[in-house]
């Protein structure tokens, strides 16, 4: 179990490093970091946490930075995220907060 925790920690470090590198402008190096993180995930059979999985394009492995490599649109309670490099789209249903309708 200890090895899987080390692998997961390294995956998170690589994805965060890729995000920082992409912000500085080196998209190719950022893609390599994410590909390496994906490889670690597959070889070690460790799931990438959802927060980090949504930080990159699953088709071209580019870190998704709003306004730089990603476009976000909201249409009728659906968030559409589009990668500006490969035009890959992902849709997420926007839901209300679970406690927002409760009367106090």
From Swiss-Prot:
Q: Which family does it belong to?
A: Belongs to the eukaryotic/archaeal RNase P protein component 4 family.
- Signal peptide positions are none
Pfam families reported in the protein's UniProt record: Rpr2 (PF04032)
Cellular compartment(s): Cytoplasm
Q: Which organism is it from?
A: Saccharolobus islandicus (strain M.14.25 / Kamchatka #1) (Sulfolobus islandicus)
The catalytic activity, as recorded, is: Endonucleolytic cleavage of RNA, removing 5'-extranucleotides from tRNA precursor
**Gene Ontology MF, one:** zinc ion binding
GO CC term, one of those recorded: ribonuclease P complex
What this chain does, per the entry, is described as: Part of ribonuclease P, a protein complex that generates mature tRNA molecules by cleaving their 5'-ends.
Q: Mark the transmembrane ranges.
A: none
| Binding-site positions, Zn(2+) | 57, 60, 83, 86
Q: According to the record, how does the cofactor bind?
A: Binds 1 zinc ion per subunit.
User: What is the name listed in the Swiss-Prot or TrEMBL entry for this protein?
Assistant: Ribonuclease P protein component 4
